[in-house]
Amino acid sequence: MDIDFRVAIVLAPIAVAAGWAAFNIGAAAIRQVQNFLNREA
């Protein structure tokens, strides 16, 4: 099975962008949940 590297070249930046977005959104979401829990306590 031969991999077509053009597909990887096209998908790599999309995957990096999606990962970066998930990282940023995840960090903000965790911060928000922690603030909510600290406020309730």
Curated annotation (Swiss-Prot):
Annotated localization: Cellular thylakoid membrane
GO biological process, one term: photosynthesis
Annotated S-S bridges: none
Signal peptide: none
This protein's record includes keyword Thylakoid: yes
A Pfam family hit: PsbY
Annotated TM spans: 7-25
Keyword terms, alphabetized: Membrane, Photosynthesis, Photosystem II, Thylakoid, Transmembrane, Transmembrane helix
Predominant location category: membrane
Membrane topology: Single-pass membrane protein
GO CC annotation: photosystem II; plasma membrane-derived thylakoid membrane
GO molecular function: manganese ion binding
Record's subunit section: PSII is composed of 1 copy each of membrane proteins PsbA, PsbB, PsbC, PsbD, PsbE, PsbF, PsbH, PsbI, PsbJ, PsbK, PsbL, PsbM, PsbT, PsbX, PsbY, PsbZ, Psb30/Ycf12, peripheral proteins PsbO, CyanoQ (PsbQ), PsbU, PsbV and a large number of cofactors. It forms dimeric complexes.
Main function: Loosely associated component of the core of photosystem II (PSII), it is not always seen in crystals. PSII is a light-driven water plastoquinone oxidoreductase, using light energy to abstract electrons from H(2)O, generating a proton gradient subsequently used for ATP formation.
Similarity remark: Belongs to the PsbY family.
Protein name: Photosystem II reaction center protein Y
Species name: Nostoc sp. (strain PCC 7120 / SAG 25.82 / UTEX 2576)
Source organism phylogeny: Bacteria, Bacillati, Cyanobacteriota, Cyanophyceae, Nostocales
Gene: psbY
